Amino acid sequence: MNALTGVLSDLDRVLLSAEDIHARVADMAKQIERDYAGRLITVVALMDGALFFVADLLRQIDLPIRLVTLGASSYHGGTQSSGQVKLQWPAGVSFTGEHVLLLDDILDTGLTLTALHERLSAEAPATLRTGVLLNKKRPRAQDSPLDYCGFEIEDEFVIGHGMDYQGRFRNLPCIGILKP
């Protein structure tokens, strides 16, 4: 019996299979390698949601990488963004003159990505690009900078492959919609 059978039974439906995710992440890695050829990339990864996506992506990039993790969230335990972004910035880390790639799991309201992009821009990196595994098709109050996108999805609350509901379901190999 598969150890995830019980967890998978909590899904209403699978949106993206593990195979779909793996193939798309490999394509994203190739594009990033082309764009950053010959450079050290400083990857800024948003935890905890981007953990699985970032781990999968970085293992496929054949370039030197410096990894910095940040805590940032606008959900705070629910299924809707609170509208308030909480940042946990690392002490003593500078991004000045670096080639920075900001990675997150999902672009939803755009608040988190925009806030972090502005904060990183203020540190005068040589370049600053952003990437997400998922981009929700939804209206946003402001455009969010986005250079790399795995998948465009409808405006639904998703779980799996690092994304959670109240701390659960991150370990799902697929991305799905939770049963109501």
Predicted regions and their residues:
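PRPP-associated nucleotide enzymes
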Residues: 1-180
